[in-house]
Amino acid sequence: MIAIIDYGMGNIRSVEQALKYIGAEYIVTSDKKEILRSDGVILPGVGAFPKAMDVLEERDLVCVLKEVCDIGKPLLGICLGMQLLFERSEELKDCSGLGLLPGEIRKLKVSYKIPHMGWNELRKEREFPLWNGLVDGSFVYYVHSYYADCPDEIVCGVSDYGMQVPGFVAKGNVFGAQFHPEKSGEIGMQILKNFQGVVEAWKSSQLSI
């Protein structure tokens, strides 16, 4: 069972429809017990970083997400949800994030139109489970004005938009997609299937303990 965290700032409907399409078991929730009972977690997000962190704090979800990370449960952040996984952001004001991934969220420094919106090529930087079954150079759908300034060793895929934009990041059981898999057609569905596979593998490992 995958928990989609509903904190009032996510693209919940499209993520829900995508999981339904691939046949994944899921629940949309902000309940701490349900999140911790799940086998994997998706943190979606649309909007401003400081507001999102305020809402997560108000709903006591920051400690839950950190516990999810600590116990090794697979966690996937999408768009703003990915950005929240990092240590801090400069959006609107200096603001602390969840601190589950090293790095900071910064404004895109490009001469191109901001937000970066539309389809872009995703190039492989290193292997990780969410690349399974994907062709290097597949096109995915972006909508964002900020990017993750983070260590190279956690960057698994990049896109060019006047600069290299980390599209895929990962460290241990924590995964992030700056683009929207749920809006990226069959490529996106494969990515979500791959995450579903990671979740099932983690669930099986817990049953054998």
From Swiss-Prot:
- Domain of life, per UniProt, equals Bacteria
| Glutamine amidotransferase type-1 domain mapped to chain residues | 1-205
| E.C. number(s) listed in UniProt | 4.3.2.10, 3.5.1.2
Q: Main subcellular localization, coarse class? A: cytoplasm
Catalytic reaction annotation = 5-[(5-phospho-1-deoxy-D-ribulos-1-ylimino)methylamino]-1-(5-phospho-beta-D-ribosyl)imidazole-4-carboxamide + L-glutamine = D-erythro-1-(imidazol-4-yl)glycerol 3-phosphate + 5-amino-1-(5-phospho-beta-D-ribosyl)imidazole-4-carboxamide + L-glutamate + H(+); L-glutamine + H2O = L-glutamate + NH4(+)
**GO biological process: any one?**
L-histidine biosynthetic process
Compartments annotated for it: namely: Cytoplasm
Q: In which pathway does it act?
A: Amino-acid biosynthesis; L-histidine biosynthesis; L-histidine from 5-phospho-alpha-D-ribose 1-diphosphate: step 5/9
One annotated Gene Ontology cellular component of this protein: cytoplasm
Assembly = Heterodimer of HisH and HisF.
Protein name in UniProt: Imidazole glycerol phosphate synthase subunit HisH
**Organism annotation:** Bacillus cereus (strain ATCC 14579 / DSM 31 / CCUG 7414 / JCM 2152 / NBRC 15305 / NCIMB 9373 / NCTC 2599 / NRRL B-3711)
